[in-house]
């Protein structure tokens, strides 16, 4: 279907993570992590995530889990407003006093003195608006690359050898990385056993891909992102949003 720039796999309930299948390993030892896993399990994820080394929910299950989590937030006094876009930040002497919000044809002011701006990397118009309003911002490193796909049977054989033929082992995954003397790193990311590659553009005329697996990970193919780290000094445009504009340029090629 035609891309809807307001409603796509980068935005909406659960955000881009909903369609990146719920890999819940962070690589940290924060004690809050186990509590987070318990909330996912209580919301319908497989309880095995509580002890798996690489907990995974699956896109098909996650679609329901995020709805349950939303209802839990509402029960605790939270409010969720779908289709309400923050179009500006109200500032007084450099301090936040509210948010300008647009819903359909109406615009209103939402008073507040604290904002957690969790907008991911695809709400580029919001970044531009904040910069134009004088909100302090600085460029940061990010990773960019491609997504590769190959038969899951190939990965199983590579990782398990003859044992892959028994049918007793789960779909195999892998992780590759290299660190060069100049500080550059290339590595695989978001490896999806038995998964699929999905279109993930959020702007017209651009090509972006993501990967996902359902809970069973029983697809015939595997995929992974192969990315390289980029520092602000690598960006052709040295402005605050230079990295973002470079992303946009590459996505349009």
Describe every region a protein language model picked out.
Residues 1-253:
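Residues forming the flavin
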């Amino acid at each position: 279907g035609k891309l809807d720039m307001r409603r796509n796999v980068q935005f909406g309930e659960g955000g881009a993570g909903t369609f990146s299948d719920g890999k819940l390993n962070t690589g940290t030892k924060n004690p809050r992590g186990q509590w987070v896993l318990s909330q996912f399990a209580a919301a319908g994820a497989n309880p095995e995530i509580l002890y798996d080394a690489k907990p995974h929910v699956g896109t098909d299950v996650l679609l329901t889990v995020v709805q349950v989590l939303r209802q839990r937030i509402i029960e605790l006094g939270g409010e969720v407003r779908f289709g309400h876009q923050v179009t500006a930040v109200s500032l007084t002497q450099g301090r936040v006093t509210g948010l300008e919000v647009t819903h359909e044809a109406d615009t209103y002011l939402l008073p507040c003195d604290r904002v957690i701006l969790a907008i991911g990397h695809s709400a580029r118009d919001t970044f531009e608006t904040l910069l134009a309003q004088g909100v302090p911002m600085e460029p940061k490193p990010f990773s960019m690359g491609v997504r590769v796909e190959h038969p899951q049977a190939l990965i199983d054989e590579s990782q398990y050898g003859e044992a892959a033929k028994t049918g007793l082992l789960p779909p195999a995954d892998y992780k590759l990385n290299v660190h060069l003397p100049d500080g550059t790193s290339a590595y695989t990311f978001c490896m999806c056993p038995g998964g699929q590659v999905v279109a993930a553009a959020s702007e017209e005329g651009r090509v972006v891909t993501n990967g996902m697996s359902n809970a069973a990970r029983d697809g015939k193919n595997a995929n992974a992102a192969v990315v390289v780290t980029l520092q602000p000094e690598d960006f052709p445009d040295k402005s605050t949003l230079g990295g973002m504009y470079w992303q946009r340029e590459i996505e349009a090629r």
